[in-house]
């Protein structure tokens, strides 16, 4: 199924250094779900890696003039009036290409924050988010995913591992040069792999995409996420896609435009 409509209107372009969201500092300090979710979609590299995991081949085939329109934390009934569960949609993501909304590839994500600690790495989450994801499937969204965004403290340095640092000599051939060995806290990798394994084991529906992402607060660098591609929901209808489009047309200024490629600079 492929269903597209004209974009008609575009949100304002947010460039590097622009203010995208104003977040209450109290929410940031307590690592609230909304604060972390907003910070996550502002990290365009990390967001893009997660989107690629969830949408697979579709992402790889997106062209030069393509991207995604992201709307965080929506009251569900504002999109589908008769919808009551879940009460909100954490992320609504509409891809576009060449000024066309690709509505049949719209993705909704149920977000859960996993607060891990070194001394309790084995602890399972109280909720996985699958009941909400099943509600999103029943409501007819074309693609549905559950995302666990993981935060943690650091491991004691005695538990850090040796890792190699390399530099790229030739990007085309893939040739690298090993530089040195350093000590690195690799707990984020363990947390993501363990968290993803739990998601896979507990997932009740193969249509639900799965994503385990580590979010490094106030630290440099990103960790590549673990994920499984979402599958098309056969309960999706053109009527639902039209409602998604109508919501975008009425609220487009509140969406974040994240392009797949940087804009082409004109001479």
Residue ranges and their predicted role:
Residues 116-129, 155-156:
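Active-site-adjacent loop/helix micro-motif of nuclease/hydrolase catalytic cores
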Residues 91-93, 105-118, 136:
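Conserved catalytic cores of phosphodiester-cleaving nucleases, focusing on short active-site segments
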Residues 29-37, 84-88, 125:
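Phosphate/oxyanion-binding active-site loops and adjacent basic polyanion-contact surfaces
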Residues 1-64, 229-267:
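Charged, often low-complexity linker/regulatory segments
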Residues 179-267:
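Charged, low-complexity C-terminal accessory regions
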Residues 52-76, 175-185, 219-228:
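Surface-exposed intrinsically disordered loops and tails
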Residues 56-107:
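Active-site metal-binding core of divalent-cation-utilizing nuclease and nuclease-like domains
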Residues 125, 134-218:
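Nucleic-acid nuclease catalytic cores
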């Amino acid at each position: 199924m492929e269903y597209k409509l004209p974009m008609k209107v575009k949100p304002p372009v947010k460039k590097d250094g622009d203010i995208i969201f104003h977040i209450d500092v109290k929410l940031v300090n307590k690592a609230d779900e909304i604060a972390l979710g907003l910070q996550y979609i502002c990290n365009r590299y990390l967001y893009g890696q997660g989107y690629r995991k969830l949408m697979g081949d579709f992402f790889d085939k997106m062209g030069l003039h393509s991207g995604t329109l992201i709307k965080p934390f929506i009251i569900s009934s504002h999109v589908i009036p008769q919808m009551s569960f879940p009460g909100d949609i954490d992320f609504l993501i509409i891809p576009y290409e060449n000024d066309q909304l690709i509505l049949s590839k719209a993705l909704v994500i149920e977000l859960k924050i996993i607060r891990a600690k070194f001394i309790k790495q084995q602890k399972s989450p109280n909720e996985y988010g699958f009941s909400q994801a099943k509600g999103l499937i029943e409501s007819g969204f074309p693609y549905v995913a559950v995302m666990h965004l993981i935060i943690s403290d650091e491991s004691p340095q005695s538990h850090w591992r040796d890792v190699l640092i390399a530099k790229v000599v030739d990007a085309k051939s893939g040739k690298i040069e090993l530089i040195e060995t350093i000590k690195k806290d690799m707990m984020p990798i363990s947390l993501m792999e363990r968290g993803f394994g739990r998601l896979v084991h507990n997932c009740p529906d193969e249509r639900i995409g799965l994503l385990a992402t580590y979010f490094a607060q106030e630290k440099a660098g990103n960790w590549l996420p673990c994920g499984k591609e979402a599958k098309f929901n056969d309960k999706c209808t053109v009527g639902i896609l039209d409602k998604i489009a109508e919501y975008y047309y009425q609220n487009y200024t509140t969406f974040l435009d994240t392009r797949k490629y940087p804009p082409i600079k004109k001479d």
